[in-house]
Amino acid sequence: MDPSKYRPSSAYDTPFLTTNAGGPVYNNVSSLTVGPRGPVLLEDYYLIEKLATFDREKIPERVVHARGASAKGFFEVTHDISHLTCADFLRAPGAQTPVICRFSTVVHERGSPESIRDIRGFAVKFYTREGNFDLVGNNVPVFFNRDAKSFPDTIRALKPNPKSHIQENWRILDFFSFLPESLHTFAFFYDDVCLPTDYRHMEGFGVHAYQLINKEGKAHYVKFHWKPTCGVKCMSEEEAIRVGGTNHSHATKDLYDSIAAGNYPEWKLFIQTMDPEDVDKFDFDPLDVTKTWPEDLLPLIPVGRLVLNRNIDNFFAENEQLAFNPGHIVPGIYYSEDKLLQTRIFAYADTQRHRIGPNYMQLPVNAPKCGHHNNHRDGAMNMTHRDEEVDYLPSRFDPCRPAEQYPIPSCVLNGRRTNCVIPKENNFKQAGERYRSWEPDRQDRYINKWVESLSDPRVTHEIRSIWISYLSQADKSCGQKVASRLTVKPTM
């Protein structure tokens, strides 16, 4: 943060304590009272101002990803992909773009331990010369549900019981038993990767398919992958309990201390690309957010590196007020038809307006670092001083005009208006393939987690049978092992 820009200039600074209006404060310890024992007088303006400010100094926490930590750095292109995209920040090897990155847990509150089993958020804001690009992802490549109509229920099921405020397995397994597509995400959620050692040792994924468009207008679907150069490291359940009991902010501290010591975290960015003409060649829908793309058919392509080399200057200003939005894209990158992505474009901006205010994009951490101009005006906590006489467009008195058209996908979309699921669900194949790729001890930890969750006394026989059926359809031996430890017969 630039002190000369975001703090009072030296011409107006003072070594003495003042009110917000600049009036001198000569006592910051004792309230103004009638006699030494009181009562307190309401005319003690600074007391009232101090308390009123304190009462309002926090904003509503994020409904998800409330617990998190941020750091700043740069993204550098290392490999030429200009044949795939006309995005300026990806224009050529050596090009650098300033970034801010936020890591988080998903479900629990702002002060919760960072060692709990949970998906982690991995969000990167690129301050490009063409506007901000927000790649808002997680440390797993898939999500529980493919349609946003289920998203609020998904989060409520994962969050604590509204009566007791305790996270309970029976609620999670009850809800997701109606969403068989969630099994693939459970193959990550109940796996080691949802107990990362810290933020530096975890992968990141854009999760959704996007589109890259080159200067000729040719589009390719794309998925983004972040690979940590220091490798992936995870904790056991026992280690997580010990670490969380010792320091509930262990991952934040590790990130901060590593950067302060000059041990800068680094990730390599890879992409997978797919020609839109090949979408129907797979036994699943490539735009289904509950699926991954096979790397043997669509190999990882190296793009660049992300280096975090600066700690934030103020946690509230650059972490709590930091706002991401998948709707923030730049020329050369576009959305896919992924149903969940399409609705996140609206939902993220909406929640930031509620959480921070309608002018959240004017905050330094959120504002683009390139020129920007529109007629979005005024509103609560507006921080701009504009003296234009014309606040409409078009106008012969204002030289502002629409930007030149940049390439966007030109595919033809058609179909009946309907509420339905996608044709190729294929809910279990990839979950089974992931399970079979593990060593036996890792499989055993996964099975034990299922047994522990399904042993919740409020999980009914019906719910257990449904989940054993799902697990058996993914991998017969996995379902049998869970069933045998629960003494429940698998049903197909």
UniProtKB/Swiss-Prot annotation:
It holds the Pfam family Catalase-rel. InterPro entries: Catalase (IPR018028), Catalase_AS (IPR024708), Catalase_clade1/3 (IPR024711), Catalase_core (IPR011614), Catalase_haem_BS (IPR002226), Catalase_immune_responsive (IPR010582), Catalase_sf (IPR020835). GO terms for molecular function: catalase activity; heme binding; metal ion binding. The keyword Iron applies. It is an enzyme of class 1 (oxidoreductase). Heme binds at Y348. It is found in: Peroxisome. It catalyses: 2 H2O2 = O2 + 2 H2O. Keywords: Heme, Hydrogen peroxide, Iron, Metal-binding, Oxidoreductase, Peroxidase, Peroxisome. The keyword Transmembrane helix does not apply. Its EC number is 1.11.1.6. Signal peptide: none annotated. GO terms for biological process: hydrogen peroxide catabolic process; response to hydrogen peroxide. The active site is at H65, N138. One of its GO terms (cellular component) is plasma membrane. Its cofactor is heme. Homotetramer. Occurs in almost all aerobically respiring organisms and serves to protect cells from the toxic effects of hydrogen peroxide. Belongs to the catalase family. This is Catalase isozyme 1. The lineage of its organism: Eukaryota, Viridiplantae, Streptophyta, Embryophyta, Tracheophyta.
